[in-house]
Every structure is written in structure tokens, then in C-alpha cells.
Swiss-Prot record:
Note: The gain-of-function mutants chs3-1 show no visible phenotype when grown at the permissive temperature of 22 degrees Celsius. Mutant plants (chs3-1) germinated and grown at 16 degrees Celsius show developmental defects, including dwarfism, with small and curly leaves, early senescence of cotyledons, constitutively activated defense responses and enhanced tolerance to freezing temperatures.
Transmembrane segments: none
Effect caused by changing G201D: In chs3-r1; suppression of the chs3-1 phenotype
Ranges of biased composition (kind: Basic and acidic residues): 1153-1169, 1209-1231
Span list, region Disordered: 1057-1085, 1152-1191, 1207-1231
Pfam family, one: NB-ARC
Function of the molecule: NB-LRR receptor-like protein that modulates growth, cell death and freezing tolerance in a temperature-dependent manner. May be involved in defense responses.
GO molecular function: ADP binding; ATP binding; metal ion binding
Gene giving rise to this polypeptide: DAR4
Taxonomy of the source species: Eukaryota, Viridiplantae, Streptophyta, Embryophyta, Tracheophyta
Protein name (Swiss-Prot/TrEMBL): Protein DA1-related 4
Biological processes, Gene Ontology terms: defense response; response to cold; signal transduction
Amino acid sequence: MEPPAARVTPSIKADCSHSVNIICEETVLHSLVSHLSAALRREGISVFVDACGLQETKFFSIKQNQPLTDGARVLVVVISDEVEFYDPWFPKFLKVIQGWQNNGHVVVPVFYGVDSLTRVYGWANSWLEAEKLTSHQSKILSNNVLTDSELVEEIVRDVYGKLYPAERVGIYARLLEIEKLLYKQHRDIRSIGIWGMPGIGKTTLAKAVFNHMSTDYDASCFIENFDEAFHKEGLHRLLKERIGKILKDEFDIESSYIMRPTLHRDKLYDKRILVVLDDVRDSLAAESFLKRLDWFGSGSLIIITSVDKQVFAFCQINQIYTVQGLNVHEALQLFSQSVFGINEPEQNDRKLSMKVIDYVNGNPLALSIYGRELMGKKSEMETAFFELKHCPPLKIQDVLKNAYSALSDNEKNIVLDIAFFFKGETVNYVMQLLEESHYFPRLAIDVLVDKCVLTISENTVQMNNLIQDTCQEIFNGEIETCTRMWEPSRIRYLLEYDELEGSGETKAMPKSGLVAEHIESIFLDTSNVKFDVKHDAFKNMFNLKFLKIYNSCSKYISGLNFPKGLDSLPYELRLLHWENYPLQSLPQDFDFGHLVKLSMPYSQLHKLGTRVKDLVMLKRLILSHSLQLVECDILIYAQNIELIDLQGCTGLQRFPDTSQLQNLRVVNLSGCTEIKCFSGVPPNIEELHLQGTRIREIPIFNATHPPKVKLDRKKLWNLLENFSDVEHIDLECVTNLATVTSNNHVMGKLVCLNMKYCSNLRGLPDMVSLESLKVLYLSGCSELEKIMGFPRNLKKLYVGGTAIRELPQLPNSLEFLNAHGCKHLKSINLDFEQLPRHFIFSNCYRFSSQVIAEFVEKGLVASLARAKQEELIKAPEVIICIPMDTRQRSSFRLQAGRNAMTDLVPWMQKPISGFSMSVVVSFQDDYHNDVGLRIRCVGTWKTWNNQPDRIVERFFQCWAPTEAPKVVADHIFVLYDTKMHPSDSEENHISMWAHEVKFEFHTVSGENNPLGASCKVTECGVEVITAATGDTSVSGIIRESETITIIEKEDTIIDEEDTPLLSRKPEETNRSRSSSELQKLSSTSSKVRSKGNVFWKWLGCFPLQPKNLRSRSRRTTALEEALEEALKEREKLEDTRELQIALIESKKIKKIKQADERDQIKHADEREQRKHSKDHEEEEIESNEKEERRHSKDYVIEELVLKGKGKRKQLDDDKADEKEQIKHSKDHVEEEVNPPLSKCKDCKSAIEDGISINAYGSVWHPQCFCCLRCREPIAMNEISDLRGMYHKPCYKELRHPNCYVCEKKIPRTAEGLKYHEHPFWMETYCPSHDGDGTPKCCSCERLEHCGTQYVMLADFRWLCRECMDSAIMDSDECQPLHFEIREFFEGLHMKIEEEFPVYLVEKNALNKAEKEEKIDKQGDQCLMVVRGICLSEEQIVTSVSQGVRRMLNKQILDTVTESQRVVRKCEVTAILILYGLPRLLTGYILAHEMMHAYLRLNGYRNLNMVLEEGLCQVLGYMWLECQTYVFDTATIASSSSSSRTPLSTTTSKKVDPSDFEKRLVNFCKHQIETDESPFFGDGFRKVNKMMASNNHSLKDTLKEIISISKTPQYSKL
């Protein structure tokens, strides 16, 4: 039994082998480390955190040969910016870490927030390399920018991989991906299929998902090898033994009812079940099995693993997760662990390891098996791997043979052909060949892809190396029916001419006989063989369909000779590919009728033959570089041909008319130097290559698809007269093309013209009329000096490497211009009307600084204009690359490094349209543009109100690979983009407004990989651009930035006499300003007012950020304006005198400087006159006048300075004194404007944000100036000297409170003001409400407020709405809590082995059970309300089986009860808990009663009642303390028992408590601590005192109580 209290998530027993220790500084405990700890615990990893710092951590005292705390395997060391790396203690700490590593522990270093590279890299690199450690770095140190969440995920993945064995490598990342897929599904019965090739890890992943998620479901079942189990046991038996066992064990339903689950649907409709069917191949079996599971409740999950994607379609699986092979890092780790026993191989073994990884394509099973096969063979590893490739290990063969045996005969034939011959060929080509072989490949290939036998990549057919080698091995096992040949030795046996055979003798037969009639395919590589072929070699090969003879090493060498010629070729040939065919003709009787592809490059053919009836099957003809070929007239019979390649056939004199070939797409006649005429163009031609021909004329034609034409030679432009529909013309590398005449009227549809590297091209016609031209390539035309004009719709222009000096007016449509290496280019003319824009002027050194400035300014102006157009779909963008000019450095306001910080003020947020970013990139001599260049920009928006920072990332494409081949010296990239600005939806929320933005710039490749030291960012600068900006030049933007800063500073200086500025409404603020101030502010409206008058809207109610003038380079005029405004507002203040003196000094000094500047100008003119007149006398006069003027000026300056300070001193002629005094005057002015920072009286920290409250003789932060009653901040307009630091309502409540219940003033009596106040909730109410029937919550003991909703339970107890939200209403709902508390006991090393039920009952049933239990009521126990009881006797209990959760106003909630007979199997028969209490309170009562059960089960029945109840109260209090920890409240109660809670060795479930639940925990603890009863209150305090005095755990204290139970002191206790 126990008194009132509450609950929390239980701890889980720590597994020392899977635990982690974290050492960190206290500053990162509540940021990175808290998130890291939570993430590790979610993965079932126990975590202990030591936040004492690296220097004072308790681990520092552990000896090097001792294990870590709790036997943890992994130590995470978080190194933050507070660590002093050069202190003497740090090397000692590293030695300790080395000792832990030597002892078998794993150290994971994490560098977090370290902002100085020089502080870390020196020693860190040497340490990491020496210890072979892999570190994790935050975004400050890493080139790859990581957010905190990404860093945590990376660390957890690393730790997870180090804790678990090798077979779980790579599992964690795949678990996360599956979880993301499941979260996207609806809350109905969810399903997911895990698909992949054999050995890829489907079963391992499914088991990991099952183990990870099974605890979240009411029941779970994993059926391994489903097909085998189904066919062995049958449907009914499988359901009964696997699913029926769930019904029996979890829901107490007989397994015989599995075929009739509808009989118990009322019990099962809300049960969440997890079922995994592994390795499903028979889709019908799986479908019939799943049909019986339609009774699963919402939220259930079905997982199926299979190599066949069609299974998922049959079983109606919602989503499919494709298991990919391990990445390089994971595969290297797994293979290294398997073969070497370490996580990463040594450098000498890395090359072979990468070969194995590439071969198996990251297959985990193959990596493990190959690793074991190669273990211990280090010296012969290369040879062993070569043998394994040709004969895969039996285990791999067995796995893959199962997949092969499940295929149909047709599918097997296709697989074998692809494995031997067609891997890597295009899909259409393979289908054409196989269709003619009657294999029906169109459907079969899709089926094979679904079964993971084939893959389609970039329109080519691919096959895994393991499957390919296994298929070849399978085929070798069926040698008696050999149909495919690829081994040179066996092919040589069939084809070779032998003199023995000619003389009548027989050759020696190979071990396995070969039958020519059975052969269907021959693929011979002649690179390693050379022999003579007999003339009738192919005579009996009637079924030969594919013949390919090639040399993989050289295309020009043939290893075959035909001493007697070749008589015949098989009639059934579909593919004839013969490189370097040595004969002049094909056999005379050879029929081309079945050929699909004829490929004979580098052959000696003269012609193709004469016996040609029909070439309807021929699709491809390739006779390239056949130098002896003179005619190919047979092409006119190939009506379905698609490709003709006769490249390099220099002897070919004519090409037949192909105008009737409807399917012909590609014709390549390049290099056919003797062809003069092209008589007919195919109607559907797509590519026509005519380079190197003598063609002078092309006939008129109308192409259905405009072709891509490649031409060359002088004035070939005229050949295109009849190409009215041509879209692409390629004249690349035509070195003898000098001029191009104008035929624009016939090129109306030309889209792309490529004339790159036409090195002799000197002139181009005016191309203005080519309205369809979009892309023009002129790069590398080194002699081209002038271009007449460009088409108006041109989008991309490449003129790099030309001799152009001036570009004409560029079209407005132009989006991309590459002028790399235009060394003579001086000017450019372009309007920025179309965005985005991208211009490359790298290595263009003739541009003047004025041209650069004007060009950049035009881009920014256009960008601003386009940014205002909301209908613009694509965000405006400008990217300009130009060489860095030192004269322009000041214009871009650059600073060293790759980081730039930009300060913002609140009213600037809405009108910001983007940023102008200037990035200087230094290119070294070894830089070559092989991978492209991008600039990665990461903008971190520092937000108000402690909101998380917003990170906006953007990649700016500078140039693609080879676009700027070689870049030298420094170049500046000017970038503008609106995407760096957050979305409007975020801006409009006040909590998301930022006060500053930090930009980081990195150089990356086109694939976003970091580039090396040859290309790096050295300087950068960022300027804010607003939509209301008037002057958009670079200098104008800088001036506007300064003006904004001045205005902002003025607003922070202004001080009102009565009401603080920040507490006023905008209207009041405006009225309070002086007319001169309003006039000044209104005059700057064009620059600082935003849309909707944002400035005036927020100036009076949003805190402005102070700016330190010392940290900014201000002009003297800026200081004067600030001082003038300050003086206008402070005329009535006493310190105005000093400010006036400083202002007068500043103004007079300015006048002197201006006079000096005028004198200098005058003197310059006079010196020029003297130079021409050579009048020495005037020079002497001028010298004297200058000296007198200098002395006069010195006297005036000194006089003014001395007068400003109120002192008189002797004049000092030293110029250093003059500068020092002027500097002192400026500093004096700045100190007046920027007084020293004050400190808050409450938190003692400096007040840096410019907002403070000056009250009661002290200065406070606004959030620290709080009411003494409610501890909430007090607004400035609520401050009153009369009531002190109280809110007005709080002060009234303190002096004359209202009744919480009736909301009326508590009446005064003759004895004064009397009221009752709850000791914890601090709610005051009239004394009369204690007896007038006002509802009182049975849980939190609060009286109910009038008019509020409340609930009366069936046993007439009241429950408030807050407690009702988390109330546990029936016995089933209490079971998860029961299991959690059992785990909590286990974490205390007090595991309860025996099982007993826990029932929730009504109050009457609890009282009845108490009487039958015959509990001896003593003392105050009679007065206690019984809310829980631990039974030891058999009896019938009426439990609540169903409670109603509706919120009804003043109505009784009914329940459904059922009788349960508790049977005595041990010392405890059952535990009864009062139903309808909140989960927290129910958990506390259950923990209390389970402590009673523990005592009885362990034979402690005769303990003193006070000590027994005290032990139970302490246990309940510890459980509540655990809840306090999980809820992450501000502080943990200092009770001695709390320090012994098993927080460090347990893992609690994730909860999201409300504020009321957090307060309810503290209420329950308060009730325990303040209980005055002899049993519960005194017992708690006595046991707690014993634990504190001896520093014992609860279990040790129990042993101590037992040990003294026989002494005389025991009775006194």
C-alpha cells in the first residue's frame, strides 16, 4: 500500500558491451551532447556523460591498463573551443587515451565549435594519424558543412558500426532510410518490401528492423525462409504455430482460433502486430498467408523480403526499399574485418581490397566469404583472388544457383547469352538479336530485372560479376550439352586446320566432347592465340547464331589465317562481328537473310557479295576503316537498316541513294575521301557525318526530325542550302575553314552551331536573322577578331580563346557567356533584362576597372528590378567571373578568409531582396579544370528569441569541366541570388527574424566534392541589397549600408524622459520625436523605408541592435551627424557641455582639413605654372608662404584642442603630438557615444543587446527583471515605486486575493482576512469551499474552478481535465507501464523474476480486496485513502476492462468490469491499482506496490512496518526522480535517494510531457517529502537518512536493515 503520488519511463538494463562514455565540457552538455546522448539511447545504446571537462574528468584518474567505466567499449571525446590544447595536462590526457586504445577500447574524437584551424590541426593531425583515429568535425573545421543534426547522425552511425559485429556494417544508415519510408505511410496497416539480389543483406536488414521496432508493437513474429516453411508445414499449420502462438502468448486466445479470428475481433481490432516474411519467392503462397491476417489492427506492420519485385505487387505492398551494395567505406571495413581482422587494411593491401570490392559491387555476403577464403594467404592473395573469380566459392554458387534455377528455360537462355556475350550492350540491340533467336526478350528482360538478375543502366544491359561468373560455372557443369563457347582453347580445337587431320589422322579429343551441331554462340578473343583456320570450319554449325571474333588488345592485328580460304558461314547467323577479316570477300553462298548486325571493321573486304535477296532483318552495318572496300550497293535492299558506319573507307567511291530508307537514323561517311556525291538523304535522318568527304552538293529534302549535321572543308556553308530544317551543325576542328558566307535565309531552324577550334576562321556573316539559333560555339577560333552581330534569341555564347577586342551589342536573351582567355577583349555591351545571368571573363586581363564596375552594377540593378516581379518563376541570379584587379579591391569591401558576417536590423528583414557576394578565388599553377568549379555558399541566419539558426545553402555553378581549362592568378566572382534569402513565410514570423547572417564560401567540383589547395577562397565580402534601394552601384550599396548604420545608432541613443521607447506604441513613438528628427528620417525614406512602411511599423516595438562605432570605419561626417542628433535629444541633460565641446572640436578640425585640401589643390596649380615659367623667385615666395601658413595652422589646431579641454599649454610643433591629440579627441567623442557596458544585477552578465531596464538603482536585462510572486518578467510600463517588483495583479493578489474557485474577493471577517491556500499549487480560496461540495480532484487535490469541465468517475471520484488527459482507464492500458517498472527494478539490480497480474479496479473493489487480504490497519493507516494494494491471498477481483475517455461536463463516466480469480503461484497473487488516475500517479503507486511484492518474494515479510513503507516510498520517489530527469526539468531534487537512481545505466522511452505533467511530478514528490504520517512520512525520512549517511544504494540499504533486524536497535527503528 501507499499514499498519493506519480510516474515516468523506466530504465533499461545497460549492456556494457554496447555502452558509450562521453567526455565533454559543460558548455556543450545541453547542446550537441544532449542531442547525441538522446540519439544513442534511441538506438538502444547505454550512455554515460561526464561533463566535468577534459582536464577534471574522472576518466583522467583511470590507469591505462584498466577498463573504462561500466566496461564501455567506446569513448567519445568532445573537444570544444574551451580546451587549451597547449596546457601541460593535455599531453598526459592523450597518453591516457592511448592506454585505453591499447586495452581494446575505441576512441571517437569530435571537434565541435573550434574556430581556429591553427589551434587544432598542428597536434590533431599528428595525433589522429599516429593513433589511426577517424574524427568528426563541426562545420567550422570541415570543408563539408554539417549542421548539428547531421553531425550527430554521423557520430551515431560511426559508434553504431564500432559497437556491433561486422555483419551489421552499414545497417544503421539503411534502418534510418526504412524508418523514413514508414513514417510517410498512413496510420493503417503499413507494409514495406525489402528487395535486392541474393547476398545483398535483405535478411540481415529485416532482422535489424525487427529487433529495432518489435518493442513498439503489441506482438511480433519473424518467419525465416518463408517459402521453405510454407511448403513444409502448409498454410494451416504455419498460421497455427507462428501466428497462433502470438494469440496464445500475448492475448490469451487459443491458437485453434487462428482460422476464425473474427470470433475475437473485439480483442484484436486495436492490436498492433509486426510480421516479417523472409525470402519470399512464391507470391501465391505469401498472398494466401496474408489474407488470413486481415484482422490486424491499425498501425500494424508487414515486412516482406524477396529477390522478385513481382511478389510485392501480388501481396499489395505499399512501398519497396531497394537494398544497395555497401559503399566503399563500409565495404572496405567489412572485407578488412573478414580477412585481416581490422577495420581498415594497410596501405599495401588496399589495392587488392579495392579490386575485390569493385568485383563484388559491395555485396556483403560475397565480401565476407571472399575475405574468409583469402584469410592467411597474404603472400598469394592476388593469385587466390584470380582463381576465385573463375570459380566462385561454393556458398556463393549455392545462393545464386537458387535464383537461376527459379527461372524459366527461355529466361535461362537469355541470361546465359547476356552473361557470355552481351553484357554492356544497349537494350534495343540485345532485344533485336534475341528476338530473332526466338527468345521473346521484351517481357523476359523486364522479368529478369525484377528478379535482380539483370540491371538496366544508361540504356545498357548490365549483370553483376558474381551472377555472370556463376552462370558461366553453371554452364561449365553442363558441358555435355555445350551450346556457347568463349574459351580460346576449345574454340581452337574446333576451328584449327591441322596437317594430321589432312593426312587422315585424328586429333586428340579434349576431355569433354564437342558437337558442332549443338553450338549456338562463339565469342573468340584472338589477343592471345594465333592459328590457321580450316576452310570448312563452320560447315556443320547449323545452329550457330552469334559469331564474334575480335582482338581485345589491338584492332589492327588478326590472329587467324585462312590458308585454304573459307567455304561457308552458317545460315542462321544473327550477329556477324569479325574484326580484321583477312579475306577479300565473304563466302559466295552466304545468305544475309537472318543477319541483324554485320560488323566487320578494319577488314580486307572489297565488296559484300552478290547473292542478296532480302536484307529485311539487317539493322546495323559497320564496315569502318575497311580500306579496300569499293562499293556497298547491297544497302538498297536493307529496308529496315538504322545505322550505316563507313568511316575511313578511303577506297569507297560512291554511296547509294538512301532516300527511301525510312528507318535510317545515322550515316557516317567521315573520312571517305573519294565520295563526291550524296544522292539521297533519308527522311528520318538524325545524324549525318560528312567530314573529310569531297561532297559539293546535298539534294533537297524534308526531314521529319531535324538532323545533326557534321561538315568540314572550305565554304561548306553552301552545302546547307537544302537543309532548311537542320537544327544542329557541327564544324568542330575544321582547321582549314577560313570564311563562312551568308545563307541565313535557308537556315531558319538552326538551333546549335558548333565551330569550336576552327583555328583559321577569320570572319563570320551577320547572324541577326537566325532567329532560332540558341547556342553558338566559337571557342578556340584564335584568328577570329570581329563578329558582326548576334541573333536576338541567343542564350549561350562561347567565345573563349578568340582574338575579339570588342563584343557588339549582345542580345537581351543571353543567359551564358564564356569569354575565357580572350586576352584582347576590352569592352562589352549588354543589357540585363533576362535573368539568370552567368558570365565568365577568366584570364581576360585587358578590362579596365571602370568597365568592370559598370558591368557589375548593371547586373545588380537588373537583379533588383527582377526581384520585385513576384510572377517570376526562376529566382533571379547573376554570376560574374573576372580577374582580380587591386584597383577594385576597395569597391567590393573584401576581407581575408572564407567567412563574412553581415549585421541586420529588424526593419531590414522584409525589404531584403538578396545579397551581393564577392568571392576571391586563388588559382595555383597546378590547377586544371578537369572536374568543373562551383562555389558553395552557406548562409547561417542568427535568429532572435533563442530560436535555432536557419541555414540556407546554395551552389553557384562557375564553369563546367574544360570550359576554362587553365586559370592563373586570382579571380573574383560576383554573385547575386535571392535564394540566399529565407522564404517569406519564415520572415513574417517574428521569432524567425535574424539579427545577423554569417556566410561561408568553399570551392567544390561539379559533383560538390571539395577541391584541393590549387583552388581556394582567399577573400570574400557580402553586401545587403534591399528592394527599396535607390543607388545600386557597388559604392552606392556600401554608402547605403553606412547610412543605415548611422540611423540605427541614432535610434539607440534617443532616450525619453517618461516612457521607454521600446514599450511605446508606434504612434506614440512618432509623436514623441522632435520635428527635426522626423524631418531627417523622412528625407531618407527612399533608402530605408520598406514596403508597407516596415520601418515605422517596427521601430517603436522591436529591439534594435547596438553597433559599436569602434568596430566600424566611420567618416568624420558620420560622427558629426550622430553627435548632432544626440545633442538635440540631450539639451536638458547635465553632460551636454562636454559633448558640445567635443562637437566644436570635431567641426573646427574638419574646417582646417578642408582648408588644407584647398591649399594643396591651389599649390598644385601654382607648381604647374612654375614648371613652365621657371621663375625661381616665385618659388622662394611660395616656400615662405607655405611655412608661415603651416605655423599658423599648427597654432590654430593647438589652440582649439587646448580650449576644448579647458586648459592652456605651450604650443608643440611636433606633428606626432598633433595626431595624438586629434586621435584623443575622436576617442573622447566615441566614448561619449558608446559608454562602457553595464552588468545585469540578476545574472551579473554584461548587457550587450542595447535593451536594459534601469530601476531601483540597478540595471537589469528585460528577461531578468521579474515579479517576486509569479517570477515572470515585468514590462517597463508596469514599473511602480509603490508596489516594488510586482505585477499589478500579483500585488493586488498578495494584498487582497481573489478566490480561485468562485473568482470573488475573499470576504474579511472580524478577525481579519482569512483564506486557505494550497501548499503546493499556491491557489487561494474561501474556507467555505472545503465543505460546500465543490469538486476536488482525487489526483492533484485541487478544487475545481467554477464553470470548468470536470469528470465524475463511476465510483464517484472527481477528476480534473488536466489529470484526465493522461488517465489510465483500464487494465490493458496499464500493462506497458507494468513492464516499464519491471525494467526499472532490473536497472536497480533488483530484478523481479516471478510473473503476477496487475489489475485496475474501482474504489469499492479495492476496499473489498483490502478486507479479504486481512491487512492490519494501524495508526494513521486507517485514515489513508487506499489507492493500491499488493495481494498475497487467493480471491476474486473485479477489474476494469474498459474505461471511457470522453470529456463530459459534470457527467458520470461508466466502465466495463469483469471478474478475475487470482491464483496463488507465489508470495504475490496480484497487484490492484485504483483506476482513472494519471499515468504519472499510477506509475508511482505501481512502483510502491511492486516494492512490497519484491520484499515478499525475497522473504522479507516481517520487516518493521515503518521501514517497509519507507523503503516503498523511497522506491517510488526514485522513480519520480527518473521522470524528472527524462522530462528535462530545470533542476533535479537534491534528495539523497535521487543520486542513486539508475539513470546512467538505463534508457528511458521518449516522452513529450506537458507543463502540467512536469508540475504533477513535483507535486507527488512534494507530497512524499512533506508527509507527516508515522508510517509513510517518517518511514521515508528514516530510510532516506540511512541511505545518505552510508552512501548506499536502495538494495544495500535493504541488506543493512536485514542485518540489524536482530539487534536491539531494530525495535527502536
